[in-house]
Amino acid sequence: MRFDLEPPSSVAAAHRIGVLLINLGTPDAPTPRAVRRYLAEFLSDPRVVEIPQAVWQVLLRTLILPLRGRASAKKYAAVWMPEGSPLRVYTERQTDSVRHLLTSNGYHVMVDYAMRYGSPNISHALTQFKRAGVERVLLMPMYPQYSASTTATAFDAAFDALARMRNQPEVRTVRHYADHPAYIHALAEQVRQYWAQHGRPDFAAGDKLVLSFHGVPKRTLDLGDPYHDQCQQTGALLMAALGLSTTECHVTFQSRFGKAEWLQPYTAPTLREFGEAGVRRADVFCPGFTADCLETIEEIGMEVRDEFLAGGGKTFHRIPCLNGASAWIGALSEIVAENLQGWPVKAAQPEPVN
């Protein structure tokens, strides 16, 4: 293995601490070419698609990318913001807000973000940390619930980058925070504030709140992935915080890909069934997505909405993700601070003068 070129080590180095927020990723532009490039990287990850690569790559390159590239580009174009991809825009804002909050509380740490797929990538971010004198790194995935296809592959990418370093930093990882009180509080506040502005569903009349999490193949549950259980745990805690029952609030799973069975119940068919059963209003919230993206804005806000209305529903509300909500920035900073304990994150105070 060839190691990265590095400057000579020095005892006078900065000895800084870095916090790296890691999200999934996004195409660089809403164009077929950019989307195909992004999907090629994403769908080539064996943590994401557990099919022998010799078979999968043929299907991916000859069938899936040519078909999905153009169709997905149209969807991205429908949600693209003036500043860029929603996921990148909101993740950048979250990073800036966490950095500001930690700094205002006396923390001397670098805070940056990276994407598992696309740019800025994890390897680049860790290299930038190293050049800035960072010797301790906290890897903070923006996935509250652990899954091998999200959290684990983010750690894989980080440790692959570290494997090329001769002088490695000390590293800590945040595995999940699905049941963290501050995270649950932020979720509940996001829902309450939305209802304060748009009206609360009439649950006595049969209205529904749906908590939609990203789906994964069911076989991953059978193979020991804790994701399903952690989604259910988050859902139960949020229901309790909102004072809702399981007849008023439902946990579902979205974004199914392929023909294999995924975690159920599926979001879109559930909303269709609600409409057909006479449910007049349905609100959908995505607790597992910490920032709005294609899957929340387009899939939930457009496709799932259309399913509900086509089934006979009358009013559909997509509650925005946590994004830059103050309760969430506070929660995220709290989780980061807890995982920095024991590291010299605050500047040494001068000795008092007698």
UniProtKB/Swiss-Prot annotation:
GO cellular component, one term: cytoplasm
GO molecular function: ferrochelatase activity; metal ion binding
Disulfides per UniProt: none
HAMAP family per record: Ferrochelatase
Residues that bind Fe cation: H214, E295
Pfam family name, one: Ferrochelatase
Primary enzyme class: lyase
Organism: Burkholderia orbicola (strain AU 1054)
Main location class: cytoplasm
Protein name: Ferrochelatase
Enzyme Commission no: 4.98.1.1
Keywords, alphabetical: Cytoplasm, Heme biosynthesis, Iron, Lyase, Metal-binding, Porphyrin biosynthesis
Pathway named in the protein's UniProt entry: Porphyrin-containing compound metabolism; protoheme biosynthesis; protoheme from protoporphyrin-IX: step 1/1
